């Protein structure tokens, strides 16, 4: 699970970088001649990012933030680069300082909180990551990336019920139905009910719900059989 999360985090960072870089560079390059030197450094940093020259990009973005402390986009990009380089403490400090700035535009605050959440995930601080993603969602209830990351954090924390509820909300926002994932999460909730909470009836009900959600879920009959066996109901266990 951890390796899968790492791959996901790298993929998110890479796609996000490509998406913003191409757009921003094209839009702002024409203004670079007349803008302050911080703007020039910012654009150079994005250029280096395009060509995967991370160390040079960090230097230029650091110069941009030093010359203009109000350049929020440069700060967030700089923090993301530090995270990719493994400088987690530094990326956390940068994104945290941006996220608490007063009078910050909504999307900038959301982006800073989301980036902060990814920092915490990379550092293994899952409870803090959970809090950061929830704050991002509170600021922007339609921020899909935060829902996706929050669901994965809940899975990492083995909080299956929270993961299920988060995925339901995500499907509602995206107008999709992730039947296979929802069924899987329901089976994990059911297993927790049966094993930890000693509530087999609730577990059986949840497993039937998982079966309705995804009739192809192979875990359902296996778990149902286990629950029936634990109850001593060998007949039902045999005919699951």
Regions found by a protein language model. Name each.
Residues 36-70, 84-87, 93, 118, ...:
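Alpha-helical segment of the N-proximal tetratricopeptide repeat
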Residues 54-55, 88, 126, 160, ...:
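TPR-repeat structural position
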């Amino acid at each position: 699970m951890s390796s899968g999360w790492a791959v996901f985090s790298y993929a998110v960072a890479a796609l996000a970088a490509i998406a913003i870089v191409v757009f921003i560079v094209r839009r702002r390059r024409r203004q670079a001649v007349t803008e302050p030197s911080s703007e020039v450094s910012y654009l150079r940093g994005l250029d280096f990012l395009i060509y995967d020259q991370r160390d040079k990009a960090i230097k230029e973005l650091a110069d941009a933030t030093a010359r203009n402390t109000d350049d929020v986009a440069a700060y967030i990009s700089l923090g993301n680069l530090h995270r990719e380089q493994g400088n987690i403490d530094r990326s956390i400090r940068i994104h945290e300082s941006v996220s608490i700035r007063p009078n910050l535009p909504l999307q900038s605050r959301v982006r800073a909180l989301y980036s902060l959440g990814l920092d915490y995930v990379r550092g293994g601080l899952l409870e803090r990551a959970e809090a950061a993603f929830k704050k991002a969602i509170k600021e922007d209830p339609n921020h899909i990336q935060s829902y996706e990351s929050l669901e994965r954090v809940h899975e990492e924390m083995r909080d299956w019920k929270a993961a299920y509820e988060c995925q339901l909300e995500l499907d509602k926002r995206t107008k999709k139905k992730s039947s296979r994932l929802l069924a899987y999460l329901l089976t994990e909730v059911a297993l927790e009910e049966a094993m930890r909470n000693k509530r087999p009836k609730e577990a059986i009900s949840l497993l039937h719900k998982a079966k309705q959600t995804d009739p192809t879920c192979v875990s359902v009959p296996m778990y149902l059989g286990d629950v029936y066996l634990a109850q001593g109901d060998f007949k039902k266990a045999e005919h699951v």
